[in-house]
Amino acid sequence: MQPDASAATAGRCRAAKSAGCYLSRRAAWLQLVQSSNDTMCVMEDDITLLDGFKPATLELHDTRHHWDMVRLMGITKRPQVEYATLPSGMRIMWMDSHPTGTQCYMITRQAAARMLAYTANIVHAIDIAFDRSWEHGQRLYITSPEYVADPGMPTMITDRSDSRTFGQRLKAKYHRKIERISSRRFNDEHRPKRPITIEIAPAAAEATPTLA
């Protein structure tokens, strides 16, 4: 099957206009679920593709049983733990704390279905929901090296000012503490203990798909 490619609305999902960004991500996932494709590469339209991007997406497609979602770039740098090395030498890395952003990532059809269920109600901005592995349970990684760059174009979505009351901020602080406990427990259970090497069967290599 071919991986699909989708360019989402430009800009970060961080502010008052983020509902459209949220819905555009869900529309891409629904497109994958309703298709015959096994994976999709979801991209924002203001990114720069680096050398090796297409071979990386094809290799990720061929090794899709080992992951659910894989970023090809992250906004912020976080400590990484190696999960796997692929035949090309590309590595798939685990992070306890994800680098935020949904500029470019691969997702499997099964993961897209689960993320649609998880994001059925808008609770968090979509890039925040994407990172909440301890809730949605998806195997979320990032590639090393990264194959996409953000040229730093201005976003169409501006930051939201904090208009919460003192009581609301206090309640949010309590919930963040509970979430840190849940996140730490999830990471301790699922963090790779030792890196693995993934081989691609000849049949899969011969059926190398192309990006749409």
Spans of model-derived segments:
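An acidic/histidine-cluster motif and surrounding catalytic segment
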Residues: 1-43, 47-212
